[in-house]
Amino acid sequence: VRYFPLGEDNFAKLVEELNNANHFIFMEYFIIKQGEMWDTILEIMERKAKEGVDVRLIYDDFGCSMWIPSRFIKDMKEKGIKVAAFNPIGPVFNLRQNNRDHRKITVIDGYVGFTGGINLADEYINKKVRFGYWKDTGVRIEGEAVWSLTSMFLSMWNYIVHSTEDYSRFMPAQHQKAPFENDGFVQPYGDSPLDHENVGENIYLNIINRAKNYVYIFTPYLIIDHEMLTALCNAAKDGVDAVSYTHLRAHET
């Protein structure tokens, strides 16, 4: 696992890995905006699709509704890119519209994956100023742990396009002959409207409740419920250094 404290660092490595793709590229993002970041990625996706690479994109229809052209899906398909919109917004609001896809996932050949808080928009790499200097973080994952990201993407893809595609041909071992070197355990996870379980919240509560020395939370959105607040307070009472860092001008799209 490699940690990127800044979006521009994450972007540089992402571009490098996308250019190395030989079998498939899966990308799933909440926000896509036209600009330097997206134009760079789109050029690679189009080129790789022409080379025979399986290139797929999932985007959240609400998150992208103000930023992409109305013919976006048609344009992508003309470039050879398979595309699916998560939960398209309609003229009539209902509670189902609250289900949004906030994932930021890229999987390349099932062996390299990227995730974190970085969407595909220029402010995330500080090519565009919005609310001052923009800080979001990301991670690059390599090896068998990437399978979790691959399966999350494919489960969402199958749900959107109503497919029953077999996942096995996308497993890392299918495209990487060398044995994986393991020096620890990495398990990416994700929430989904399909799960009917608050996976993320349960993991956070477990981490807080088991903390012995400190809990440091870094987030632009500090909106916690009573159970989470109680866990943090109890940890502090037990001598754990419980600190949450947030921004005074957290944005909302």
Which positions does each model-derived feature cover?
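Conserved small/polar residues in nucleotide/adenosyl-binding loops
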Residues: T246-T253
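Helical hairpin unit composed of two closely spaced alpha helices linked by a short loop
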Residues: Y221-V240
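Glycine- and other small-residue-rich loops at beta-strand/loop junctions that grip anionic moieties
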Residues: F30, P220-Y221
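N-terminal localization/anchoring segments of enzymes in phospholipid and broader phosphate metabolism
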Residues: V1-N202, N206, R210, N234-K237, ...
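Conserved small/aromatic sequence motifs within transmembrane helices
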Residues: E197-N198, I217-F218, I224-D225
